[in-house]
Amino acid sequence: MTVKGKIWPPIRIFAFFVVLLSMSPCIILARNYMMRVSLLDKQGCGYSLQMPEAFLSQRAIERRIRQHLQLDSTDLPLSKLYLDKIAARGVRIVSQSKWNNSVLVFGDSLALLKSLADLSFVRNIELVYIEPDSLKEFECPRRTVAFPELDGTDDATALQLHQIHLDQLHQAGFRGKGMMVAVLDGGFQYADHIPALKRINKIGERDFVFPPSHNIYREHSHGMKVLSVMAVNEKNLFEGSAPEAEYWLLRCEQTQTESRSEEDFWAAAAEFADSVGVDVINSSLGYSEYDDDEQKYPYRQLDGHSMMISRMASMLAQKGIVLVCSAGNSGDDSWKKITIPADAEDVLTVGAVTSDGINTVFSSVGPTADGRVKPDVMALGGYCSVINADGEIAQQNGTSFASPLIAGAVACLWQALPDKTACELIELVRQSGDRYQWPDNIYGYGIPDFAKILEKEKYVNGNK
């Protein structure tokens, strides 16, 4: 699911400019831009691969060691020398990507932004954001009464856990303990007030959008619902897919515009997740078109590498992280195909099925432009149980909710099989699908069986 986000300036400022325009035809409406500036190298970055503790947490370093992964130049921060020279031009650096070796700069002079191409260390520039003529500021619904505690007599999540046989892992004691999960989304509305979400194992939160929100808990509710599918731990009422895991809440999606700048925000969030030692990322965000028609991409670029966000997603497994992402909800519209970064390599792209195991009409389909099977696997996304913005149990549709089911399941499986690498886990999940022998572009490898994976691995290793 793609959600839309808040942006600066708010509408009252635009209204003021519109009045001035009506008074004087000579006044030109101010407009802001963002430019992605790719750099040639990292000379003068001031860091060394021999001292990774200067730019990675100990947990991130240990994750690489455990999976026998080598550090490389993409792990190094950007050149401070280059950053200083860019800032000296009078533009504002609002985001950085060390993996892409690029920065996102903001300014109100397109000519000034374009002049950055003249710098000797700049590889290329790309205009990724043009401010719209007018926008409404996102308004979070006001609450006048306290949120309720969950109520009911049935376990609302029993079906969605059982469909992928995750309930058996939970019963065996594998509930995500010791695993760290990052949720990349557009907002986590009232996750700080809803009782069931206040009790989750949250480590922290960050906002990577420019301009940042005053409070990510007063932004869109989409991320809160996604989080609930994984993290809530209310016995016999609502059990998330990884209720004992620890969670980072990372906002990287604007809520009212769609532009390629959001790829930069996503990359910054993913790199932060890597640096703090996250094991699994859930991204229930996807892009198939942007507000500016010139920024839209054709199907032939759905190859895992043409778009920045997909390139960064394809790198995560090589950093020791499993990325689980939603396939998209375009199955019943003209696009139909998966959305980026679901086209990435070495990730688990998740489509949506009903409780009967039938694909939902909205679930996006594959293949990728280079012929790879997508989606990878399926989970419940038709009437999936979530906690809604009123703090109550509800059933909602979307691959956005199928994805966190699989992300949490991967965290639980990794807890059970700590010696596996990210790439090995991804392949094990695919192989457990009920259509692994005959994959297609609707179901991918089918509905995975996490109990089957664990049983097989224990027997293979001689531990019944």
Regions inferred by a protein language model and the residue ranges of each:
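Active-site-proximal beta-strand/loop segments in catalytic clefts of secreted hydrolases
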Residues: 39-41, 107-108, 128, 183-187, ...
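N-terminal domain-start motif of subtilase-like serine proteases
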Residues: 93-97, 112-113, 137-183, 206-220, ...
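Subtilisin-like serine protease catalytic core
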Residues: 168-206, 212-262, 276-279, 292, ...
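Catalytic-core environment of secreted peptidases
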Residues: 194-205, 352-401, 437
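Hydrolase catalytic cores
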Residues: 227-230, 250-254, 337, 381-443, ...
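Inhibitory N-terminal propeptides of secreted protease zymogens
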Residues: 31-140
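Substrate-binding/access-modulating region of protease and related hydrolase catalytic domains
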Residues: 233-236, 249-343, 369-372, 389-403, ...
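Bacterial Sec-dependent N-terminal signal peptides
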Residues: 1-33
